[in-house]
Amino acid sequence: MAERTHACGKVTVEAVGQTVQLKGWVQKRRDLGGLIFIDLRDRTGIVQVVFNPETSKEALEVAETIRSEYVLHVEGTVVERGEGAINDNMATGRIEVQATKVNVLNAAKTTPIIIADDTDASEDVRLKYRYLDLRRPVMFNTFKMRHDVTKTIRNFLDTEEFLEVETPILTKSTPEGARDYLVPSRVHDGEFYALPQSPQLFKQLLMVGGFERYYQVARCFRDEDLRADRQPEFTQIDIEASFLTQEEILDMMERMMTKVMKDAKGVEISAPFPRMTYADAMARYGSDKPDTRFEMELTDLSEFAAGCGFKVFTSAVESGGQVKAINAKGAASKYSRKDIDALTEFVKVYGAKGLAWLKVEEDGLKGPIAKFFGEEDANVLMNTLEATAGDLLLFVADKKSVVADSLGALRLRLGKELELIDESKFNFLWVTDWPLLEYDEDADRYFAAHHPFTMPFREDVELLETAPEKARAQAYDLVLNGYELGGGSLRIYERDVQEKMFKALGFSQEEAQEQFGFLLEAFEYGTPPHGGIALGLDRLVMLLAGRTNLRDTIAFPKTASASCLLTEAPSPVAEAQLEELNLKLSLKEEK
């Protein structure tokens, strides 16, 4: 078999007159009665091959048997297309290859999906036949971008003198948040490894070990409820450094992301990135990962509501809640009563009891609650919300968390429905000054807002023992277009501070020692100040490639039920395998 001389998508007018050896898949076959045209595809693109009896009767006879997705080796001569046959939409659209020889390297059955960007296959079918789905150019281009992003990050961190170090996949189960994936040990009866939710503890131990600058393209595993932008196994760019301040870390990440955007996406972005405190983000956008590509911020009306004539508003404020609103500019005519009812049902998903609304008309406010506001209150309301005729005003009165969640989600929905979002924009944002702990009423205890190893502000360390809910974290999240790209922080590096943190989280001294004794001891041997960040590679690629589903950025992803339709994992195992592990199944009966 002759060696390939050209990739299909790289045959241009410079090759006219040359004999070329091409290898690839049949994208399309057209029989024009005496002439057969084949679009031959490889990962670089498509080239048109012509089978003409005047050039080679033998090649034409073989071409008559060829079908879509056959794998071919074609030898032929590159010629220019006639004036009327030029296709400027193709990189190879000014030439074609006159075939002199063709060899079928492999035949193909009729494929269950159309191998084209606009395939008609459902996602389940695409995942079952993932190896065919990956042939589509849009999929290859996504993974080419993933490669480019990873390469750029590696090159950047190399110039910054970071070492790439691998950390264990089989590790210890620790209570870090999501459920662990457990792996039974054959050697140690009744004991289990856990797959890492992140390399958090090991990267901190590398700082104890004096490596100073570490990174890893790390596989992480979390047994949690899935959604469109989550997978049970995912990849993060894990970065940690000693002796750097928060400002130095943020500056370095901005330089890295600027280079990624330029090299992998061809987009120039400016740094430094805007910054917003967690409290400000929640107050203005109802989200800790605000999409700043459009306006429509939340407005706090609690002070106004306390003295207005609408009991729903006043009672919410009196019970310690708040009233907030968003002004959908010019949207009054675009939303019927039925449409607003749909918005009401939407906010109920986030815990809201309802959605109050008003339309602004030339002669004043109209809507079911307009009667509760006199002229003076109506003017205050309109001035506060900067409302003019044609605007739609939407209100939620409830607990602060419910108001934020419901209006934050409603804002995003309206942004999409009203086409307010400029999809060409890439708005990076740092969200800083997070709360260190969050209180869970159901569990009646505090949980770490990020993780238990986040350093509080120095002046807040004592609050861990007196008022944990007031302690602030030296933490920062990088947000892009309303998605959390990654989170980081300065880390606790002193044993006494870490013990106070564990105590605030409800760990007894014995539990802390049992779970994290190795880390606490490490902190007694001269641990340097350190911090870092972990960026979600899958999510970053999803946003840069313009995909809407994280599964499109992972070669062989899982479904929403954490199963692989291609290999049918997870699957039962043989009884002998269980016996070898000294395990016995006790399955719950389905009701």
UniProtKB/Swiss-Prot annotation:
ATP binds at R222, D223, E224, Q231, E484, G536, L537, D538, R539. Residues 200-203 are annotated as: Aspartate. The record marks G84 as: Important for tRNA non-discrimination. GO terms for molecular function: aspartate-tRNA ligase activity; aspartate-tRNA(Asn) ligase activity; ATP binding; catalytic activity, acting on a protein; nucleic acid binding; transferase activity. Keywords: Aminoacyl-tRNA synthetase, ATP-binding, Cytoplasm, Ligase, Nucleotide-binding, Protein biosynthesis. It catalyses: tRNA(Asx) + L-aspartate + ATP = L-aspartyl-tRNA(Asx) + AMP + diphosphate. It comes from the Bacteria. It is found in: Cytoplasm. NCBIfam families: aspS_bact, PRK00476.1. Belongs to the class-II aminoacyl-tRNA synthetase family. Type 1 subfamily. This is Aspartate--tRNA(Asp/Asn) ligase. It comes from Bacillus cereus (strain AH187).
